[in-house]
Amino acid sequence: MFVIGAVGFTAASMLCALSWSPGVLIGARAIQGLFGALMLPQGLGMIRQMFSPSEQAKAFGSFGPVMGLGAVGGPILAGWLVDADYFGAGWRMIFFINLPLGLFAIIGAFKFLPEFKSERSLRLDLAGVVLAGVGGFLLLYPLVQGRELDWPVWVFVMLAAGLVVFGLFGIYENRRDKRGLDPLVTPSLFGKRAFTGGLAVGMAFFGALIGTGLIFTLYLQVGLGFSPLKAGLTTLPQAVGMIAGFVAAGSGLTERLGRKLLLFGTIVMMVGTAGVAVTVALAGADLTPWHLIPGLLPLGVGMGLAMAPFFSIVLAGVDDEETGSASGALTSVQQLGGAFGIALLGTVFFGLLPGSVTSHVDDSAAKLTAVFAEAGVPAGQRPAVAAAVRACLHDRVAEDDPDVQPASCESQSQAAPAGLTEFSQGVVKDAFRDSTVFSLGVAFLMQLLAFALAFLLPREARADAGH
């Protein structure tokens, strides 16, 4: 299954790179996700099979941070590839790079990974797959697209329908298990606090992690005008901190501290998030990558410390025959949590921008008047021109596509007063700063929720759990 997933993911990456239309790219990305979902659970399951009980804590502890490091390091690599524009490929290179990586994974799997088979023949739960897939789509699509579509009524109908479908999924899986058939998700897992608590923690934790990454990238690239490479390098201290946190956790802290390490790591993450928010608020438009190091470094350290024991604690509380099912559910919740975080923080971020822009224009009325006076705009025309500037900036930040010029800005583009461009850029940067700070505050609350939910997990990850 791992090899099938790797082959499919690599082929889908090739299709993404060769896409000739947005529709093809979207379809190829969906295929990527499908085969990626085949790979990830196998990794967790094979760890349980390949390592002895005494070694599993460190093995599980390596899995989460490696995934998180990929999420943090990915933007750095992507920014470098886009800026370098190798062979004139532009953004396509971020998909072409998956070809050698995928080939390496496939060869490595055949060479180093043993083949494990169940002692009894298993039948794929096709109906369960369909129900889970439909339920996931009904929840994820409106969460991701709701803001762009201005939250029409049918979006909330889809969300409600998604919950109903997942309810039917649970009933179906329970009945299938009672009939002695193989369920997609073992119902007995939901009776174990380690598993249900892990799902809740993962939802909040990865929602904050992935959502914050998106918001911060938008602020750096769109708000401050950083290039993709510069934006990626700006987050390098976070990646370094994460490696340091992972190394510290792997030195024996996971075995000695268990849940306490996850709690401590989450606290360090919260400190880092607060530090980044304060830095952004104080530095404003003068922000440089150097300013962010004191906040991003502990943010990364906390990520490493928290993620290292996460999978170990959760999976140590399930039986051997439940590992595959639990692994699949955990990785699914990780993706669902990421989508929820993107939807929530994205809605907050973009929802605040238009109002923040108009507020800053109103607060800077004296400065705008000085710009008009210097440009020789007659006093009688200044209120109308100021209103037009206000409308233009409001519509510009509310536009989904930053390359599209709103109709309200077309009348100004040809005869803009001198100094107005600088004024407008300053207002937009201030609005992005305010939206980023508030969104980081929401992410802080999500991390606080993950901290509280972590008390549902076992106190320690016993290496002999399930044996």
Residue spans of the language-model regions?
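Helix-loop-helix hairpins in multi-pass membrane proteins, especially solute transporters
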Residues: 1-127
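Residue-level signature of the transmembrane alpha-helical cores
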Residues: 2-8, 12, 28, 35, ...
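Small-residue-rich alpha-helical segments with characteristic i,i+4
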Residues: 40, 45, 57-73, 235, ...
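Hydrophobic transmembrane-helix bundles of small-molecule transporters
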Residues: 83-200, 208, 226-227, 234
